[in-house]
Curated annotation (Swiss-Prot):
Keywords: Protein biosynthesis, Transferase. The keyword Protein biosynthesis applies. Belongs to the Fmt family. PROSITE patterns: GART. Its EC number is 2.1.2.9. It comes from Histophilus somni (strain 2336) (Haemophilus somnus). (6S)-5,6,7,8-tetrahydrofolate binds at residues 112-115. This is Methionyl-tRNA formyltransferase.
């Protein structure tokens, strides 16, 4: 088994963890492709991606084209003479010319058990939908969106308290090893390509701040899953009104489900040290950890000590 010459394409920390694994392996990373530096923070200063920072630390050439569609970009890729391209959360579309550049193709690490969740937010949607299991898939890329033939899958459980943050960490711990296993056996054909079953596919739409607003006409179970799925971004939230009539927005970090009470959706049923209990279409959502604007997250008990007027029994949110 000879070491492979690899082009790595990725952008966030999740991708950087895969690059780190490659750098510690027998394989050679010839170059790294990552998205252009983006403005960040209040000062909107340009910030390099996690992948770029790691690559430069190891003196690996970094390229940041805005697109891979230009002929000169594709020609440069070809001249690098790599065996394979590894793509992890890169964020740019790979045109057919790029997909056909490398003898062993382009491999992608995807954060779901394909074809269950294709698209931009597979980790979040798995929690949102109430899936009990998820995992990572290593696939050969084609022109479709996460539609390529699957080479290797690794599973992990989704616990009842799982957030996107914790699940992201789980997948980041198992995915690099899965990638290396595929790379080590790629030339020998040790991994048989499996065509995806289109009838089992779902599209994991991007999350939005609009979707993160709690909709009390859903069930308490659905809302509790939303709260976990949308943590750390965009964070589920709701709006209440204080005694002065001012609207107050609160993010929700933690909640639990209580038995149903026959009250209109959005009605505050109780507000005490156990939490703020709100009626939903099915069941009661008990809000346990919240964050008012400009404050740190706090327990419902601590919030009620200073802001009890925000939560009147019988008030409809």
């Amino acid at each position: 088994m000879k070491p492979l010459n690899i082009i790595f394409a990725g952008t966030p920390d999740f991708a950087a963890q895969h690059l780190q694994a490659l750098l510690q392996s027998q394989h050679n990373v010839l170059a790294v492709y990552t998205q252009p530096d983006k403005p960040a923070g209040r000062g909107q200063t340009l910030r390099a991606s996690a992948v770029k920072i790691l690559a430069e630390k190891h003196h690996i050439p970094v390229y940041q084209p805005k697109s891979l569609r230009k002929v000169e970009v594709q020609e440069h890729l070809s001249k690098l003479n790599a065996d394979v391209m590894v793509v992890v959360a890169y964020g740019l579309i790979l045109p057919l010319a790029v997909l056909q550049t490398f003898p062993l193709g382009c491999l992608n690490v995807h954060g779901s058990l394909l074809p269950r969740w294709r698209g931009a937010a597979p980790i979040q949607r798995a929690i949102w939908a109430g899936d009990k299991k998820t995992g990572v898939t290593i696939m050969q890329m084609n022109e479709g969106l996460d539609t390529g033939d699957m080479l290797h899958k690794v599973c992990c459980d989704i616990t009842p308290t799982e957030t996107s943050t914790s699940l992201y960490t789980k997948l980041a711990n198992i995915a690099p090893k899965a990638l290396l296993e595929v790379l080590d056996g790629l030339e020998q054909g040790l991994f048989k390509a499996e065509v995806q079953d289109e009838s089992l596919s779902n599209y994991a739409e991007k999350l939005s701040k609009e979707e993160a607003k709690l909709d009390w006409s859903l069930s308490a179970e659905q809302l509790e899953r939303c709260i976990r799925a949308f943590n750390p971004w965009p964070m589920s939230y709701f709006v209440t009104q204080d005694s002065q009539g001012t609207l107050q927005t609160l993010k929700v970090y933690q909640a639990s489900v209580l038995p149903h009470q026959n009250k209109p959706c959005g009605t505050i049923l109780a507000a005490d040290k156990r939490g703020i209990q709100v009626a939903t279409a099915n069941g009661v959502l008990n809000l346990e950890q919240l964050q008012p604007a400009g404050k740190k997250p706090m327990s419902a008990r601590d919030l009620l000590n200073s802001r009890a007027d925000w939560f009147k029994i019988g008030q409809v949110l």
